[in-house]
Amino acid sequence: DAQVIGINNRDLHTLTVDLDTTKKLAVKIPEDRIVISESGISSHDDVENLSPYADGFLVGSHLVASDNLALALRELIFGTHKVCGLKTLEAAQAAYDCGAYYGGLIFVEASPRYIAPEAAKELMAVPLNFVGVFQNASLEFVLATAEDLSLKAIQLHGEESHDYIERLREK
């Protein structure tokens, strides 16, 4: 008569994890019960795939292993969405508040969404993972901007050569 039923995806003898365990067993549980899928959930895709079978998820080790619990939880719930073209602190905060994981900063002067690296420093107060968008910029500019702003990723939108990309990767 339990109202909440947990389905452990971990085999306690071998410690292997099989997320299909939830799919196989959930169909045997009465529909008026709350089903919790336990163990092995580590991505938004896992949550999406198991949502038709479970009402909730027990996630522990994936979150505990994260350096940033808030971002790890955000990624698990919303996935890794990027809102690009952020130019103001208010816009960056709104993107974060709405579930964004990445914030895109466009360092292409010809773009109407351009932000100068100096102005972008203010946006770093928002706990997003920031991505710098560059187009045919010098390697030195890209590297200096990435370092100054602690960018999590670099996105190239120009005609950068394979050699340019390889040199960028080496840094």
Predicted regions and their residues:
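N-terminal hydrophobic targeting segments
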Residues: 73-131
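Glycine-rich phosphate-binding active-site loops on the catalytic face of alpha/beta enzymes
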Residues: 7-15, 41, 53-73, 100-113, ...
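Glycine/small-residue-rich hydrophobic helix-like segments
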Residues: 2-40
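Catalytic cores of alpha/beta
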Residues: 1, 22, 37-59, 64, ...
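N-terminal active-site wall of soluble small-molecule enzyme domains
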Residues: 1, 22-25, 105-168
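C-terminal helical cap(s) of enzyme catalytic domains, especially alpha/beta-barrels
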Residues: 19, 24-28, 51, 63-81, ...
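Structural preference for beta-strand elements that scaffold enzyme active sites
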Residues: 3-6, 34-36, 56-58, 80-82, ...
